[in-house]
Design a protein with these regions (language model features):
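Right-handed parallel beta-helix/beta-solenoid
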Residues: 25, 45-83, 102, 449-453
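Surface beta-loop-beta hairpin patches that serve as ligand-binding interfaces in beta-rich domains
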Residues: 46-49, 87, 424, 428-445, ...
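Acidic Gly/Asp/Thr-rich repetitive segments characteristic of extracellular carbohydrate-active
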Residues: 64-99, 109, 434, 479, ...
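Structural detector of coil-to-beta-strand junctions
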Residues: 137-141, 163-164, 201-202, 225, ...
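Right-handed parallel beta-helix
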Residues: 118-124, 148-159, 178-197, 209-225, ...
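Extracellular beta-strand-rich solenoid/capping regions of secreted or surface-exposed proteins
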Residues: 82, 86-91, 103-118, 126-183, ...
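Predominantly extracellular beta-rich ligand-binding scaffolds that present long acidic/polar faces
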Residues: 106, 111, 311-454
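Bacterial Sec-dependent N-terminal signal peptides
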Residues: 15-55
Length: 518
């Protein structure tokens, strides 16, 4: 009987091992990521969603009234986006064309490159996931780190327990993957989309993702699900160490926490010509206070800078409870010609310059300071009732810093704070005291910038013609108009063409972001 039991266990173990999917060595996957067992293997390798069937390239159509038994042609469309994703050719890719109406998502999973997902011309497709089931963590999930060349255009994305869209990476928290082999989804374009009413973040970008463009989108009502009830962590765009991200001509509004940030060592990001209104925390943020240590690349960033070489320019920010612009452990940040209105309503500061706080690194806790900042031609306006400071240094920045030609205005007295360290700080009133104690803003002004109802410069504004020359860094304004040789201060260049409406004019089908042109 004992021998029979041993034989049965051996037989069961052999059967289980024979069913185990064969994996391929990492070097072989590097050479051919589409080999079976590699991240970009085709569904035919062993995908129950495709049942080993053929893949499709070219165009495929999906309609709420279609059938997954169809062939995906325009005349016989699939019913679900997941079916189209499952049959996508892993090398040639697939153009997925969505007919108008609502497409239900049970977390659409993409795992191949060269995906172009968009609405049928003249129609508007809505992709909707529920926010109450944790297993449906994202409405759209690009799950394979090796994937690249992803375009999402002219669609509306809503829901997801955590995220509207998530781009994945192989960056692990136990540091088992060498830095040189860490990567995420690359070459991403999100164009003319609405992304809203998500459980937490509208767009989630994980460490190692690269070359991300978010253009002409409307992003709103993050953090609407049960996942955010206790967390209060729901950005419009949450980018952790995703480099080369450009966010342009987007309209963010009614965001639970920060409109967008790039932190964790993200490099070479650009935030420009965006409109941000009504944020529960900050508006435009480079870095953050306490990113987890495992998300930094300490080979290229041993100092744990949160943000490297970011450019923030020509944005309008209205109504933030915390900072209008926040720089945390930022290296070489450039902040030019932004207009920030009614910022720091409840806490923080209109302009926050702060150290980072990275805990639990292999060599102990780290507190990197900002370094080599350039902040010019910005307008900061607070209401008389604002509880936050006008500006704050939480750790004096290092290196060579040029903070100049800015306008600060608040009815009544301006308030400031400088923290040299945890036990040595001062809170004080008066712009002259700020200049003396911070050694910044020598050429800046405390005066009413005279803005109109659209947050553009009114006739007679003292900001007209008084900006610092910045060459090719600032060639256009918020509206896309040419600046010319003599810069104004703020996001608007006066009298250079038609101003965009603020907020943007709603359109029946789709979105145009701010209405600006890329």
């Amino acid at each position: 009987m004992k021998k029979l039991l041993i034989f049965a266990l051996f037989t069961l173990f052999t059967a289980l091992m024979s069913c185990k999917k064969e994996t391929v060595e990492t070097d072989e996957c590097d050479a051919d990521p589409t080999a079976c067992g590699c991240p970009q293997e085709p569904p035919s390798c062993n995908d129950p969603g495709n049942n080993g069937g053929p893949t499709i390239s070219g165009k495929v159509y999906v309609s709420p009234s279609g059938s997954d038994s169809n062939d995906g042609s325009e005349a016989k469309p699939f019913k679900t986006i997941q079916k189209a994703a499952d049959v996508a050719d892993p090398v040639k890719g697939l153009e997925i064309i969505l007919r108008g109406g609502t497409h239900l998502s049970e977390e659409v999973k993409f795992r191949t490159s060269n995906i172009n997902l968009h609405s049928y011309p003249g129609e508007w497709a809505v992709i909707k996931a529920i926010m109450t089931v944790e297993d449906i963590s994202s409405c759209l999930w690009f799950r394979e780190p090796e994937s690249e060349n992803i375009t999402i255009e002219n669609v509306e994305i809503t829901g997801g327990y955590y995220y509207g869209i998530k781009f994945e990476s192989n960056w692990d928290d136990d540091r088992s993957v060498p830095f040189e082999k860490r990567r995420g989804v690359r070459n991403i374009k999100i164009l003319n989309c609405k992304i809203h009413d998500t459980g937490r973040d509208c767009i989630k970008i994980t460490p190692g993702c690269q070359n991300i463009q978010v253009l002409n989108c409307e992003i709103y009502r993050s953090g609407m699900g049960p996942a955010n009830v206790s967390a209060q962590n729901a950005e419009g765009i949450d980018n952790v160490n995703g480099s080369n991200m450009t966010v342009r001509n987007c309209y963010f509004h009614d965001i639970a926490t920060n409109a967008l940030y790039a932190k964790g060592g993200a490099k070479d990001c650009i935030f420009e010509q965006n409109l941000i209104m009504n944020c529960g925390e900050g508006g435009l943020v480079a870095g953050y206070l306490d990113t987890d240590a495992e998300w930094f690349n300490t080979t290229t960033n041993p100092t744990y800078f949160e943000s490297i070489n970011i450019i923030i320019r020509n944005n309008i920010v209205v109504n933030t409870k915390w900072e209008g612009i926040g720089l945390y452990a930022a290296l070489n940040a450039q902040v030019y010609n932004n207009t920030l209105i009614n910022v720091a309503q409840e806490a923080s500061a209109g302009l926050m310059i702060a150290r980072g706080e990275i805990y639990g690194t292999p060599s102990g806790d780290k507190y990197p300071k900002c370094k080599d900042l350039k902040i010019s031609n910005n307008i900061f306006v607070q209401t008389a009732s604002a509880k936050g400071k006008m500006a704050r240094l939480r750790g004096v920045p290092e290196g060579t810093n040029d903070v100049s030609n800015n306008f600060y205005f608040k009815p009544g007295t301006l308030t400031f704070r400088i923290d040299k360290n945890d036990d040595d700080y001062s809170e004080f009133d008066g712009f002259a005291n700020w200049k003396t104690q911070s050694k910044l803003d020598a050429n800046s002004t405390n005066a009413d910038p005279k803005l109109d109802a659209q947050y553009h410069l009114a006739a007679g504004s003292p900001c007209i013609g008084n900006g610092k020359a910045l060459g090719t860094l600032i060639e256009k304004d918020y509206d896309g108009g040419v600046r010319g040789a003599k810069l104004d201060i703020g996001a608007d260049q006066a009298s250079n063409g038609t101003a965009l409406p603020v907020p943007p004019t709603a359109v029946a089908n789709g979105t145009k972001g701010t209405g600006g042109s890329n």
